[in-house]
Regions:
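A short His-aromatic
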Residues: 105-106
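Conserved N-terminal segment of class I S-adenosyl-L-methionine
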Residues: 1-98, 109-121, 135, 139-151, ...
Length: 238
């Protein structure tokens, strides 16, 4: 799994803190008491720092060796450096596990094992991963939400759509969270007030779509295709 450069974190983290607070406020009321949380692929620890502000007692982050100590939003001892491409070992289980926009960075052959690792650590997994053509730095395994749901189902976990419907029209939340994030709950685990109106699993957020079709590279490609068609069928200069 390749690392992010320092500028990536400094830019993205400003957009993440508000989203983390709002989303956690929506998820926590559904769960039994949350006193321990782990974040797999935590980056510089923005979500963990928000959890700390909310009074969660036990917090643990997991990410690679490329995350610099000086960038961290959490105490250094709260981060355990691991290779996410290898099986993860859990000394304890957690009340809630996070893995947000991480799985798409891991090789396709790691997908099933990664989900297995997550489910070994908690009955509740808040998960999001990039969909096909979402784009991003070193995305090597972009999959539809239903792909991941199938892997979780194989481990006895079902998706609870408590984030996407609530924040779909909220422009202050990054669209990849509103598009991709699902709470996976172990079958039989207690859940308060489950959402009544879940969305289809495989969806594309309008903001993500517009970001693609308005990108200069996409528009240039369309112009080339148009010129090629006019040249082939109408003899116009290419």
């Amino acid at each position: 799994m390749k690392h992010y450069e320092s500028y990536f974190y400094s830019t993205r983290d400003r957009d993440t803190r508000h989203a983390a607070s709002a989303i956690l406020d929506a998820v926590f009321p559904l769960l039994p008491r949350v006193s321990s949380v782990a974040d797999v692929g935590c980056g510089v620890g923005v979500w963990l720092s928000v959890l700390r502000e909310k009074g969660v007692e036990t917090l643990q982050g997991f990410d690679g060796f490329w995350v610099e100590d000086g960038q961290l939003e959490i105490p250094v001892e709260m981060l355990k450096r691991v290779d996410l491409e290898q099986p993860l070992q859990w000394p304890v289980r957690y009340d809630l596990l996070l893995s947000l926009e991480v799985a798409e960075h891991l090789p396709p052959e790691r997908a099933a094992g990664f989900v297995e690792d997550l489910t070994k650590a908690s009955d509740y997994v808040l998960f999001s991963a990039a969909i096909p053509r979402q784009g991003g730095y070193h995305h090597v395994n972009e999959r539809w939400q239903s792909f991941w749901a199938g892997l979780f189902a194989g481990r006895g976990y079902s998706p609870v759509d408590c984030v996407r419907p609530r924040f779909w029209n909220d422009d202050s939340i990054p669209c990849w969270y509103s598009q991709n994030m699902l709470l996976y709950v172990k079958d039989g685990a207690p859940l308060k007030h489950p959402p009544v109106y879940p969305m289809p699993l495989d969806v594309v957020h309008p903001a993500a779509y517009l970001g693609k079709v308005n990108h200069p590279d996409f528009r240039y490609g369309l112009s080339l295709a148009k010129r090629a068609i006019l040249h082939k069928y109408f003899g116009k200069p290419f």
